[in-house]
UniProtKB/Swiss-Prot annotation:
GO biological process annotation, one example: nuclear migration
Main localization, broad class: cytoplasm
Coiled-coil region: 60-129
Pfam families tied to this protein: CS, NuDC, Nudc_N
Superkingdom field: Eukaryota
Organism listed in the record: Rattus norvegicus
Induction of its expression: Up-regulated by prolactin in T-cell lymphoma. Maximum level of expression occurs at the G1/S phase transition of the cell cycle.
InterPro entries for the chain: CS_dom, HSP20-like_chaperone, NuDC, NudC_fam, NudC_N_dom
Residue(s) carrying N6-acetyllysine: K240
Basic and acidic residues composition-biased segments: 75-97, 121-131
Keywords from the UniProt entry: Acetylation, Cell cycle, Cell division, Coiled coil, Cytoplasm, Cytoskeleton, Microtubule, Mitosis, Nucleus, Phosphoprotein
Gene this chain is encoded by: Nudc
Modified-residue entries (Phosphoserine), positions: S136, S139, S261, S275, S278, S286, S299, S327
Protein name as annotated: Nuclear migration protein nudC
Length: 332
């Protein structure tokens, strides 16, 4: 049997022919055997039974290949499903532990008083932190942080620092991302186990809505960028947390927010090492590794890979021309 390239040689012609058969594969096969009967001696040219034997052998060969391809596809899908489920479970567990979730039950006076006290304490802590940053309070050990803040671009000031998953921990939900996908966990504090009929999850190419039926949605906005709806999914973890998995269309981009109404994260502080490089193809992986290297070099004030190449070329040129004086030369 021929190789894959040989097999695909006539695909264009056969596809055009198949498209003209309204009866589908059955009509196409009938046309092919009609051609063999009318234009060749396939059925009568050899020994008795040879034509049938050839047909059976050919069918068995391609049937085995088709069954093998189907098994491999199912195995890949099962592996991907299991990995997504494990990732969603881990994210849900973290969200359940770290995020209080939206309150949908009526608070007692005691709970309301305690909640207000926590809010006031948080505001005091934030004001204290602002004073430290503005220099109105002296704080030992803050010099390095202040220097780092000074070095930050003006346009990046005020942006959130990414969480360990290169996303954001927000009051009502948290999300993480890799270059190719994004995972979201929305915890709900309810007195019953959530079921599919209790929640509303609507994933569109550029819009996402998540919430409980009869309640205002927790998320209802335009996504930062487009996603593959057919490869995205959602499920309920532990009866309390809704997790959503989104497949990005642009797999060479870090999102700075989930939906456009969210606060931005500083993508310059993203750590690509937290992403699964093993999931990327070789070309994309090499590009990401280069990005990681250049990011580390910049953070240490060292030249990037491109700058190093330029320096090496310049050094070779200078070594080859010792008679030239480069002491007053300026290089960009």
């Amino acid at each position: 049997m021929g190789g894959e390239q040989e097999e695909e040689r006539f695909d264009g012609m056969l596809l055009a022919m198949a498209q003209q058969h309204e009866g589908g594969v059955q009509e196409l096969v009938n046309t092919f055997f009609s051609f063999l009967r009318r234009k060749t001696d396939f059925f009568i040219g050899g020994e008795e039974g040879m034509a049938e034997k050839l047909i059976t052998q050919t069918f068995n060969h391609h049937n085995q290949l088709a069954q093998k391809a189907r098994r491999e596809k199912r195995a890949r899908q099962e592996t991907e499903r299991r990995e997504k489920a494990e990732r969603a479970a881990r994210l849900a567990k973290e969200a359940k532990a770290e995020t209080p979730g939206p309150q949908i039950k009526e608070l007692t006076d005691e709970e309301a008083e305690r909640l207000q006290l926590e809010i006031d304490q948080k505001k005091d802590a934030e004001n204290h932190e602002v004073q430290l940053k503005n220099g109105s309070l002296d704080s030992p050990g803050k010099q390095d942080a202040e220097e780092e803040e000074d070095e930050e671009d003006e346009k990046d000031k005020g942006k959130l620092k990414p969480n360990l998953g290169n996303g954001a921990d927000l009051p009502n939900y948290r999300w993480t991302q890799t270059l190719s996908e994004l995972d979201l966990a929305v915890p709900f504090r309810v007195s019953f186990r959530l079921k599919g009929k209790d929640v509303v999850v609507d994933i569109q190419r550029r819009h996402l809505r998540v919430g409980l039926k009869g309640q205002a949605p927790v998320i209802d906005g335009e996504l930062y960028n487009e996603v593959k709806v057919e490869e995205s999914s959602w499920l309920i973890e532990d009866g309390k947390v809704v997790t959503v998995h989104l497949e990005k269309i642009n797999k060479m981009e870090w999102w700075n927010r989930l939906v456009t109404s969210d606060p931005e994260i500083n993508t310059k502080k993203i750590n690509p090492e937290n992403s699964k490089l093993s999931d990327l193809d070789s070309e994309t992986r090499s590009m990401v590794e280069k990005m990681m290297y250049d990011q580390r070099q910049k953070s240490m004030g060292l030249p990037t890979s491109d700058e190093q190449k330029k320096q090496e070329i310049l050094k070779k040129f200078m070594d080859q021309h010792p008679e030239m004086d480069f002491s007053k030369a300026k290089f960009n």
